[in-house]
């Protein structure tokens, strides 16, 4: 179940919890948004940033025990 977080400090606290298993970073070049998604036991927490400097600092401050994956944009399926 998804849940959006607006505060960076609260997001870092969630990342440090024991039930946080993996993090994904999704970059959208068209809207200049960077989404951080953290999978916990009950919720998938999402933080949306528009500042790339803050995003790099947040990526560096994520705990090393968390599995971090950069997600590339998927190609659209072609119809026959």
Swiss-Prot record:
GO MF entry, a single one: structural constituent of ribosome
- Any one of the GO CC terms: cytosolic large ribosomal subunit
Q: Which InterPro entries match?
A: Ribosomal_eL38, Ribosomal_eL38_sf
Q: Mind listing the UniProt keywords for this protein, alphabetically?
A: Cytoplasm, Ribonucleoprotein, Ribosomal protein
Q: Which GO terms describe its biological process?
A: protein-RNA complex assembly; translation
Main location per the UniProt record: cytoplasm
Superkingdom of the source? Eukaryota
Localization per Swiss-Prot or TrEMBL: Cytoplasm
What family does the database annotate? Answer: Belongs to the eukaryotic ribosomal protein eL38 family.
Q: What does this protein do?
A: Component of the ribosome, a large ribonucleoprotein complex responsible for the synthesis of proteins in the cell. The small ribosomal subunit (SSU) binds messenger RNAs (mRNAs) and translates the encoded message by selecting cognate aminoacyl-transfer RNA (tRNA) molecules. The large subunit (LSU) contains the ribosomal catalytic site termed the peptidyl transferase center (PTC), which catalyzes the formation of peptide bonds, thereby polymerizing the amino acids delivered by tRNAs into a polypeptide chain.
Query: How does this chain assemble?
Result: Component of the large ribosomal subunit (LSU). Mature N.crassa ribosomes consist of a small (40S) and a large (60S) subunit. The 40S small subunit contains 1 molecule of ribosomal RNA (18S rRNA) and at least 32 different proteins. The large 60S subunit contains 3 rRNA molecules (26S, 5.8S and 5S rRNA) and at least 42 different proteins.
Name of protein: Large ribosomal subunit protein eL38
What organism does the UniProt record list as the source? Neurospora crassa (strain ATCC 24698 / 74-OR23-1A / CBS 708.71 / DSM 1257 / FGSC 987)
């Amino acid at each position: 179940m998804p849940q959006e977080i607006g505060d960076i400090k609260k997001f870092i606290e969630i990342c440090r919890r024991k039930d946080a298993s993996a993090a994904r970073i999704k970059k959208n070049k068209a809207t200049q948004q960077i989404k951080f998604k953290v999978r916990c036991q009950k919720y998938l927490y999402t933080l949306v940033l528009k500042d790339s400097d803050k995003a790099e600092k947040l990526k560096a401050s994520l705990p090393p025990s968390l599995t971090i994956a950069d997600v590339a944009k998927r190609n659209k399926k072609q119809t026959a």
